[in-house]
Each structure stands twice: as C-alpha cells, then as structure tokens.
C-alpha cells in the first residue's frame, strides 16, 4: 500500500508519494488574456505564452476551502495521468487542512476523498502538526516547539507539546503572502505604473526584491538619499514575455541614476517598498490591521501557557511557510522576541532549509511510523460509521 502526502495550501499544493520527492504546484486555475476560453490548471501555467494580466481562480478564500469545483479539477489533474497516476485501490492519503476548519468543509473533504476518489485510508491533519513531527524527529531531546506558519492567507502561531497542539494558545494573524502582494500592487500602481491586474508579475517582484529590515527607520533614511548613496534603491526590469520571460534586478553598475534608460525595457524603481511591504508582518497596524505582529504574538502565545513550560517553547521557535523566505526574516523575529523575553530564558529561532516543503516532509515521516495505521480512518471504517469516526480520530 503506497501513501500519497498532499500539503494542500491555499497557494501551492506540495505533493508526492512518501517514498518519492516532493513537487510544489500552484493550487489553482488560471485564465490568460490571450486565450480567454481556455482554463489552465496547476502547473499548466508554464504553457501560457503571455502571463500578463493572468486571472487566478482559487479554491481557497480567506484560508478556507470554499470552491470545490476548482479544487476537484486541480486534484483530478494531480491524481491523474499527467501527474501522479494514483491507483486509488492501493493508496492512502495524508492531507492537510486549516486550523479550526469548519465542520461542513471537513465533511465535504471526507466525502470527496472516500466516496469520489475512493482512497483506502485517509489522515486529515493540520500542516503545523506535520512540521512539529518533523522537528521532534530531528530534535528527539525536545518536548515542545512553537510553529510559526506564515503562508498565503494568514500566519498561525501554534505551540506543540509532545506532538499535541495547545489550542488555548493558538494565534492567527490575518496577514499572509496574498495581502503583501496586493499591498505592493497598490503602492506601485499609485506611485509608478498601473499593475492592479498583474498579480503574477508583482508576486514575482515581491519574491525577488523584498527583504525584512533589521532597522526600519535607518533603512527609511537611506531610501531617501539621492544617487549612489541610496543603497536600498533597485531597478527591476519587468518581463515583456517576448524577449524577457521573467523579470530581474538590474546589476548596480548598470543602473542609470539620473535620466532614462536607452533600451526599451520597462523599469520599476523600488526603494522603501522593498522593506515596507514585509514590515506589515511585524506591524500590521501600518496598514490599519489592529493586530499584533509576529514576534509579539509568539511571546503572547507562550505567555498563555504554564510558566514551567515557557522556557522550552522560547528555545524551539520554528519558522515555516513562504513568507519566512524573505531575507532577514529569521534575524528580525529572533531580535524582537529576544527583546520581549526574560533575560534568563534562551531564545532560538530555527529556519528549516526549505520552509515551504517542511510540513510535507513531516507527513512523509508520519507515513513511515509504526502507529500510522492507528492514526488513519480506513474506507471500511468510514462506510460503517460515517463522519463521526473522522471527527473522533482527527484533531483539527
């Protein structure tokens, strides 16, 4: 019996057999301006010749799976002959879902996995639980960790003790990668070019140029300087999808600091946008979201736990999710948490080698556990007892 591990994120699906490697694939469908009638699914995005003005059709809204038609089509593609050629009669599935997922969504997922696809056994689990499992496997002497999962829709801060989540201390911050990309689109549209329809391009800009500032006000001062002294300023060449397929940053020595470029390239000049956008993760109030930033929320979450456990959490802070890839993210989380923590506590912040696939790797390890069979719900169980057996088994 093989096991398929699917970390079903709101932006990317991380999928692969437990004996194999992982693929990161867009969990959505696309329509392009040029081929209006055709819908592209998942990694068919690579077939789109001109991805400008790309229209996204997402199965998730605000972090919850609501568009089942789109999700089914993405899964059909992933499980079908183009990708994983799943033999449902000989396959179990480990699949992730959000914290405190709605009962109706959980039941729909049971029905689709068991009744439509007919998997032999299912384990539905939070992505953070898989990350915690991976962390405890790598650090067997540790009993506690706090998973900071900063993804597309929002950021969750979840303490785990002996692989059990502490529900009373879970915190959700309503800031994720989607909000950052949208904010960058608004800033650029207001200051330079109208890019409100260019989600795909601006998301790439964000990933290429943004970083987390270690000293926001100092960087702001540098960004105001003229010419060579402004080390923050960068020129980004936008793709035209004929000669330039993917945007890139101009090397500093090629930057024209005054006047215009001779070549016909379309240029975005970015300065304080580079660090002001990721700053929202640390100060959501900058754009009117009255919530704590990530470091403050980590400390607040740990302070909600019994005092004797707190030192163990402070020294096992694990960063996962796409936003943790911003340069400087780990250092900023560490320095701010350190400032807010009693001096006699050790603080350690861990950034895994690949924070996007970290929970998938945890799922791969769980599938190799001796007690894996006790964790899943089999198809016979489900056919006999319905949703109630899933409700008992899965701690969502």
From Swiss-Prot:
Taxonomy, superkingdom: Eukaryota
Keywords: Acetylation, Activator, Cytoplasm, Cytoskeleton, Nucleus, Repressor, Transcription, Transcription regulation
Primary localization class, coarse: cytoplasm
Swiss-Prot/TrEMBL GO biological process terms: negative regulation of transcription by RNA polymerase I; nucleolus organization; positive regulation of transcription by RNA polymerase I; regulation of DNA-templated transcription
Name of this chain's protein: Actin-related protein 6
Family as reported in the entry's similarity comment: Belongs to the actin family. ARP6 subfamily.
PTM-bearing positions, type N-acetylthreonine: 2
Subcellular location: Cytoplasm, Cytoskeleton; Nucleus; Nucleus, Nucleolus
Modified residues annotated as N6-acetyllysine in this record: 260
Subunit structure: Component of the chromatin-remodeling SRCAP complex composed of at least SRCAP, DMAP1, RUVBL1, RUVBL2, ACTL6A, YEATS4, ACTR6 and ZNHIT1. Interacts with CBX1, CBX3 and CBX5.
SMART domains per record: ACTIN
Protein task: Required for formation and/or maintenance of proper nucleolar structure and function. Plays a dual role in the regulation of ribosomal DNA (rDNA) transcription. In the presence of high glucose, maintains active rDNA transcription through H2A.Z deposition and under glucose starvation, is required for the repression of rDNA transcription, and this function may be independent of H2A.Z.
SUPFAM superfamilies attached to this UniProt entry: Actin-like ATPase domain
Coiled-coil residue spans: none
Pfam families: Actin
Keyword Magnesium: no
Entries under InterPro entries matching the protein: Actin, ATPase_NBD
Gene Ontology CC terms, in alphabetical order: cytoplasm; cytoskeleton; nucleolus; nucleosome; nucleus
């Amino acid at each position: 019996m093989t096991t398929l591990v699917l970390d079903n994120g709101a932006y990317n699906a991380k999928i692969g057999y437990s004996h194999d490697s992982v693929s990161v694939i867009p969990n959505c469908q696309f329509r392009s301006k040029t081929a209006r009638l055709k819908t592209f699914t998942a990694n068919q995005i690579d077939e789109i010749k001109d991805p400008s003005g790309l229209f996204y059709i997402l199965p998730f809204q605000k972090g919850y799976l609501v568009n089942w038609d789109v999700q089914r089509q993405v899964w059909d593609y992933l499980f079908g002959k183009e990708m994983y050629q799943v033999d449902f009669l000989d396959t179990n599935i480990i699949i992730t879902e959000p914290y405190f997922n709605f009962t109706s969504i959980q039941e729909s997922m049971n029905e689709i996995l068991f009744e439509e696809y007919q998997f032999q056994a299912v384990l539905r689990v939070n992505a953070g639980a898989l990350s915690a499992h991976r962390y405890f496997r790598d650090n067997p002497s540790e009993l506690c960790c706090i998973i900071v999962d900063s993804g597309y829709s929002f950021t969750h801060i979840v303490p785990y003790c002996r692989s059990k989540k502490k529900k009373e201390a879970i915190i959700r911050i309503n800031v994720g990668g989607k909000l950052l990309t949208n904010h960058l689109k608004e800033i650029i549209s207001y200051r330079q070019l109208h890019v409100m329809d260019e989600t795909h391009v601006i998301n790439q800009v964000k990933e290429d140029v943004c970083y987390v500032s270690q000293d926001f006000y100092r960087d702001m001062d540098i960004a105001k300087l003229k010419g060579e002294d402004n080390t923050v300023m960068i020129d980004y060449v936008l793709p035209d999808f004929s000669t330039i397929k993917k945007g890139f940053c101009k090397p500093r020595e090629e930057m024209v600091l005054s006047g215009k470029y001779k070549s016909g390239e379309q240029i975005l000049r970015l300065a304080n946008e580079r660090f002001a956008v990721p700053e929202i993760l640390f100060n959501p109030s900058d754009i009117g979201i009255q919530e704590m930033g990530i470091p403050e929320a980590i400390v607040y979450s740990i302070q909600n736990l019994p005092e004797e456990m707190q030192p163990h959490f402070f020294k096992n802070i694990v960063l996962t999710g796409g936003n943790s890839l911003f340069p400087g993210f780990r250092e900023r989380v560490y320095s701010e948490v350190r400032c807010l923590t009693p001096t006699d506590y050790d603080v350690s912040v861990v950034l895994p080698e690949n924070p996007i696939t970290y929970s998938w790797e945890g799922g791969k390890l769980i599938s190799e556990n001796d007690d894996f069979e006790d964790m899943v719900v089999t198809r016979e169980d489900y056919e006999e007892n319905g949703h109630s057996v899933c409700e008992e088994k899965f701690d969502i």
